[in-house]
């Protein structure tokens, strides 16, 4: 059967370049764990827990907190392309596979990017239209820079949730492997993540 695109042109988002730093510092996490700053035996493990917590929070909240490069992939062009995992600072490129399967780039000067909270919208300027694409999954790819420009802008709820998750997984290493959290703790973390989500959607 011929390939048919989904009715709703939603993006799948992948990380191209992950964040350089940590959502909370190693010293911050060790302080919350009540570990002596001179004790370094678990530094590698704690750092990994911080990264896991950051991934969990960003995925659940549907936003990018730390600065990173993302790629949103669509099955086709639609009048407006929605980049839902923001905040978006810069759109690097809009690329697509043409009807012959060759990779092409939409000229940046033909597009307009507008931002609403953590969502960025891309549309063609008057006088221009989106080109035809190959009928295939992920025919369109938008690469963009996302995340807060300064650590001082990180949502406080995200920092608090990260500390809670790091403590929980540090105390229960068997749960770290699956990235799961206890039900009672889940309510607290979910409440914090919901606040981030509500703030993002405004």
Language model: regions and residue ranges:
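Divalent metal-cofactor coordination and adjacent catalytic microenvironments
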Residues: 1-202
């Amino acid at each position: 059967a011929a390939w048919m695109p989904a009715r709703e042109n939603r993006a799948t988002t992948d990380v191209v370049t992950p964040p350089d730093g940590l959502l909370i510092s190693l010293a911050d996490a060790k302080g919350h764990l009540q570990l002596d700053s001179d004790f370094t035996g678990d530094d590698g493990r704690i750092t990994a827990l911080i990264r896991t917590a950051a991934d969990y929070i960003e995925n659940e909240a549907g936003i990018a907190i730390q600065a990173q490069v993302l790629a949103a992939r669509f099955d086709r062009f639609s009048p407006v392309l929605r980049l839902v995992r923001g905040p978006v600072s810069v759109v690097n490129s809009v690329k697509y596979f043409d009807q012959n399967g060759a990779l092409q780039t939409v000229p940046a000067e033909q597009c307009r990017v507008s931002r609403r909270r953590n969502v960025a919208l891309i549309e063609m300027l008057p006088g221009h239209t989106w080109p035809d694409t190959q009928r295939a999954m992920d025919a369109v790819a938008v690469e963009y820079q996302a995340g807060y420009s300064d650590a001082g802008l990180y949502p406080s709820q995200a920092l608090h949730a990260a500390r809670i998750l790091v403590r929980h997984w540090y105390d229960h290493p068997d749960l770290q492997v699956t990235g799961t959290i206890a039900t009672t703790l889940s309510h607290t973390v979910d409440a914090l993540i919901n606040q981030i989500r509500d703030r993002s959607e405004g």
